């Protein structure tokens, strides 16, 4: 049976922990200059309907380091952008490639693609979930803290794809999560209900960023207006006043807390320059770890 990586809810705690372990092994080999061409001779299609810097570079480099050949495909220059049915593209790509990564808008697109694909499909981002990023974030936490158990995670800002995926991760892995989101910008209701039924840890939501951040071990945020929401920028700026991760807000967290941001950051909006450049910031290690965790995901699915 073909295994895909579309959302964290497809996986058990043990399976996700296994990916963290493999990621550590691959990162160590890369740092030591030890070849780890686990996908030698394979080809991986990288389909982008949403443009990206980190996703494209980390996947292309990761595919190459695993010994495979990356194929960048933009919807603007492919038949997908001209209305070819997803199921047709999926079946054809599977005849040429050994795996597919898709970065797109609707979660239903990656799910339909996977349904018709005979090779593994990886969700590089949708409007609902961003599983590769949360896995990179958690791998970074493990590196800094030695694990995630017993920690309090705080999310401040939009209840977007990042927040939705953090909620799934907390329910599966069993850590406490406190979210602070303005009214009208809460996480997806179905994701929330699923997590509340499953979670053995505390997953809470408030409108008060100070309440969410207080005594947190990990503090996380993201842009207020995601790609495709640019026309809502002014409205969102007004709604998110008081939700900026600044020195005063971060000071409410534990003294040894770490700050995460998936990037790109709008400094002075959701996070200040002093915080992202400060001693608590793990943002650059977090960005690097996209490479390592995605290699672990690809290797586990495609080798």
Curated annotation (Swiss-Prot):
It catalyses: carbamoyl phosphate + L-ornithine = L-citrulline + phosphate + H(+). It is an enzyme of class 2 (transferase). One of its GO terms (biological process) is citrulline biosynthetic process. Transmembrane segments: none annotated. Its EC number is 2.1.3.3. It comes from the Bacteria. Pathway: Amino-acid biosynthesis; L-arginine biosynthesis; L-arginine from L-ornithine and carbamoyl phosphate: step 1/3. GO terms for molecular function: amino acid binding; ornithine carbamoyltransferase activity. Gene3D superfamilies: Aspartate/ornithine carbamoyltransferase. Carbamoyl phosphate binds at residues 52-55, 79, 103, 130-133, 262-263, 290. PROSITE patterns: CARBAMOYLTRANSFERASE. It is found in: Cytoplasm. One of its GO terms (cellular component) is cytoplasm. L-ornithine binds at residues 161, 222, 226-227. Keywords: Amino-acid biosynthesis, Arginine biosynthesis, Cytoplasm, Transferase. The keyword Ion transport does not apply. It holds the Pfam family OTCace_N. The keyword Cytoplasm applies. InterPro entries: Asp/Orn_carbamoyltranf_P-bd, Asp/Orn_carbamoylTrfase, Asp/Orn_carbamoylTrfase_sf, Asp_carbamoyltransf_Asp/Orn-bd, Orn/put_carbamltrans, OTCase_ArgI. NCBIfam families: orni_carb_tr, PRK00779.1. Belongs to the aspartate/ornithine carbamoyltransferase superfamily. OTCase family. Reversibly catalyzes the transfer of the carbamoyl group from carbamoyl phosphate (CP) to the N(epsilon) atom of ornithine (ORN) to produce L-citrulline. This is Ornithine carbamoyltransferase.
